[in-house]
Structure formats: C-alpha cells, structure tokens
Amino acid sequence: MHDANIRVAIAGAGGRMGRQLIQAALALEGVQLGAALEREGSSLLGSDAGELAGAGKTGVTVQSSLDAIKDDFDVFIDFTRPEGTLNHLAFCRQHGKGMVIGTTGFDEAGKQAIRDAAADIAIVFAANFSVGVNVMLKLLEKAAKVMGDYTDIEIIEAHHRHKVDAPSGTALAMGEAIAHALDKDLKDCAVYSREGHTGERVPGTIGFATVRAGDIVGEHTAMFADIGERLEITHKASSRMTFANGAVRSALWLSGKESGIFDMRDVLDLNNL
C-alpha cells in the first residue's frame, strides 16, 4: 500500500452513501481521496468529487473506468449492489488493492467469493460500519448467553423505502451473533415471515420483522422476551455519516495488512472485550 496517506476510491460516488463517504474521506487525517467511481453513462462523470459531495473542489474527478483509476488508490470502498461489488472485488484482487465492503444482500456464492479473495487481499466486510451497532452486536452475544435459552428472541428492523434487501444485513448479523452465542446455526432457527394460521411460536427460534417506510436511516431492536419481563437492545441511526466514518476508519486500519478478511469488531478491537 501507499507509504503516506491511505488513498481511497469511492464506488457509487453520486449516491447518498457515496457522497457521505467522500466527505468522511476528506475529513479523516491519514486518509486521502484518490478516486471516485460512477456507472458508465452517468451525468455525474467528469464532476469534481468534492464539489459533488458539497465539500469543495478536490481535483478528483468522477470516472467510470476502474482501469483509469487503478494507480490512484490503495483501498476501494464499496457500498453499492452485490453484482457491482463482485466485479470491483475481482479487479481489486487482480491488482492487489484492499477493500472495505459495506454492500449487503449477497447470496452465499457472493460471500464465498469475498472469502476467497481475502486469500490475496485485505478486506473489511461488515453488515454495518457504525461503532454503536458493533458494540450492540457484542452486547447481544453477552445477553444471549445469559438469557437466550429461556426467552423468545425477536429482531425488528426498519429502513427507508428505497432499501431493496430484507432483512437488512445488520439484522442478519444480529441473528448470527445471537445464534453463535447459543451454539446454533441461524439457518436452522431463523423465522423470516409469519402469515395466516402459524400455530404457537416454536421454542428456540429467532424471529425477524421488517419495516420499510419514509426516510428511516436504520433502526434495529433485539428483544429477549420472557413471562413478566423483556429486555430490548436497540440502535437507531439518524445519519449515514456514522456508517461513512466507520468505513473510512476501516480503510485506514487496513494499512499494512496484505490479506485476510476482517469486520468492524476487528477494527474496534471488540473481540478482546
């Protein structure tokens, strides 16, 4: 990687998240905005990335070709769609570039492709880059070990009307954290929908409920419900900047790492708590 500042490239630079990633990259010491990418045919091509994000002129123009920017970045930050991210992953693997992946909605084959690429490049792959969410995941592990065998566990998540995958990647990560703490496989105990005459709740399952409405940035609650009491652990995001700041912080953390797959718990050193 580059010897001075870590140079980052931002995918989907013209989107809501892309613009905030640009702002975060310009604000964090030790990080330099090296490149910004948009899809072929976008009206934003040729724009100054900083001006696009409302952060002033940077001299970095929005481009559509990975080949054109391959010498301008060390770490590629991607919060786009699975198919696009996997194309970017193949390019980064070929050229020895690190990646921060915040894209959600991968199928198992896509997740395996990311794990395979981590043999050659360093990747931070997380469902959510918020510091608060990742602290919540740690708390869920602790709560599940104490209460999980005796309570009904439900995960409720809410996002804006434009989100295309459900449950959210964060909700699934919550379920996985709880299931792992209980020595279970989430695939075996998750319940993703209830409709009609469902019968009584099956003990030991983890239920999911999804809301899509308005401009909700992201709200997640895990409920451990018993007779007479329930514990709820909730995280609410009011700005995408919390995700952008965490992603850029992750890119800086990748400095000096040649290969491997990591998540935000590694970046925040939560695994040692």
Curated annotation (Swiss-Prot):
Keywords: Amino-acid biosynthesis, Cytoplasm, Diaminopimelate biosynthesis, Lysine biosynthesis, NAD, NADP, Oxidoreductase. CDD domains: DHDPR_N. Its EC number is 1.17.1.8. It is found in: Cytoplasm. NAD(+) binds at residues 12-17, 38, 102-104, 126-129. InterPro entries: DapB_C, DapB_N, DapB_N_CS, DHDPR_bac, NAD(P)-bd_dom_sf. The active site is at residues 159, 163. It catalyses: (S)-2,3,4,5-tetrahydrodipicolinate + NAD(+) + H2O = (2S,4S)-4-hydroxy-2,3,4,5-tetrahydrodipicolinate + NADH + H(+); (S)-2,3,4,5-tetrahydrodipicolinate + NADP(+) + H2O = (2S,4S)-4-hydroxy-2,3,4,5-tetrahydrodipicolinate + NADPH + H(+). Transmembrane segments: none annotated. It is an enzyme of class 1 (oxidoreductase). The keyword Cytoplasm applies. One of its GO terms (biological process) is diaminopimelate biosynthetic process. NADP(+) binds at residue 39. It comes from the Bacteria. SUPFAM superfamilies: Glyceraldehyde-3-phosphate dehydrogenase-like, C-terminal domain (SSF55347), NAD(P)-binding Rossmann-fold domains (SSF51735). GO terms for cellular component: cytosol. Coiled coil: none annotated. Pathway: Amino-acid biosynthesis; L-lysine biosynthesis via DAP pathway; (S)-tetrahydrodipicolinate from L-aspartate: step 4/4. (S)-2,3,4,5-tetrahydrodipicolinate binds at residues 160, 169-170. GO terms for molecular function: 4-hydroxy-tetrahydrodipicolinate reductase; NAD binding; NADP binding; oxidoreductase activity, acting on CH or CH2 groups, NAD or NADP as acceptor. NCBIfam families: dapB (TIGR00036). Belongs to the DapB family. Catalyzes the conversion of 4-hydroxy-tetrahydrodipicolinate (HTPA) to tetrahydrodipicolinate. Homotetramer. This is 4-hydroxy-tetrahydrodipicolinate reductase. It comes from Escherichia coli O127:H6 (strain E2348/69 / EPEC). The lineage of its organism: Bacteria, Pseudomonadati, Pseudomonadota, Gammaproteobacteria, Enterobacterales. The gene is dapB.
